[in-house]
Amino acid sequence: MNIYLVEDDEIYAEFIKKSLTQNPGYTVKHFHNAEDALAAVNGKLPDVMIVDYKLPGMSGIELYEKIKSLIREENKVILLSAIDDGNMVLSFIQKGVRDYVIKDETVIESLVAILEGKEDEFLFN
């Protein structure tokens, strides 16, 4: 599974990258900002994009808006945020975001559950 990680916090990005690449078949390419990730997309999305909401320059939701027309059933775009705000999550959903993960102690488990299509199993256990 080809994953683009868009995260400006180098340490946090390395944590996510190392954790996810322990799973066979996962490759993670890290981008420090939305502009670089958008340039890499170049009309074709990777299998998954994990995008921090708060980035320097273009925000994660702005990046989502720019790539939304490219998203197909086989693609996933997961927004990450340290902010646990119901109104913000509702605004993401209204814009079409299907997957949102809070940066907390379960972030890796949440991401893996989404990547494996087991969100419901993870959420309701």
Where are the language model's segments positioned?
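Active-site residues of response regulator receiver
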Residues: 52
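Two-component/phosphorelay signaling modules centered on CheY-like receiver
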Residues: 10-29
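Short amphipathic alpha-helix used as the core "switch/output" element in two-component signaling
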Residues: 61-73
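The feature encodes the CheY-like receiver
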Residues: 56, 85
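Acidic catalytic/metal-coordinating carboxylates
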Residues: 33, 59-62
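Conserved acidic carboxylate
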Residues: 7
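Acidic, metal-coordinating helix/loop segments flanking the phosphotransfer/catalytic sites
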Residues: 30-48
